[in-house]
A protein has these predicted regions:
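C-terminal structural segments of small proteins and small subunits
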Residues: 13, 50-78
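Conserved beta-strand/loop element in small beta-rich adapter and peptidoglycan-binding domains
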Residues: 35-43
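Short, acidic/hydrophobic/Gly-rich beta-strand patch recurrent on exposed beta strands
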Residues: 18-20, 34, 54-57
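Short, structured beta-strand/loop micro-motifs enriched in basic residues and often containing a Trp
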Residues: 13-26, 37
């Protein structure tokens, strides 16, 4: 059973696989950073007010705005 959700719904420490992007602008930005569908992404931190969030992809720490994270569909890894 698939457990797909928006990246913005994950909590620190949760891991997921990037499935798709709902926004081409976000896709191009993240693709330039090496974030592609099929890559593992880990939530590192969430700012106190929920924006931005810090994630780790391919060993790199990236900061994403909440509205960007809402456009990334992931499958949670258990």
């Amino acid at each position: 059973m698939e457990n797909k959700t928006k990246l913005s719904d994950l909590r620190p420490g949760q891991q997921a696989i990037i499935m798709q992007f709902n926004n081409n602008e976000i896709f191009l930005k993240l693709m330039e950073m090496g974030c592609l569908p099929g890559e593992k992404i880990v939530i590192e931190q969430v700012a106190p007010l929920g924006d931005p969030i810090s994630v780790n992809v391919l060993g790199y720490s990236l900061s994403l705005r909440l509205n960007e994270a809402e456009q990334i569909i992931v499958e949670i890894i258990h």
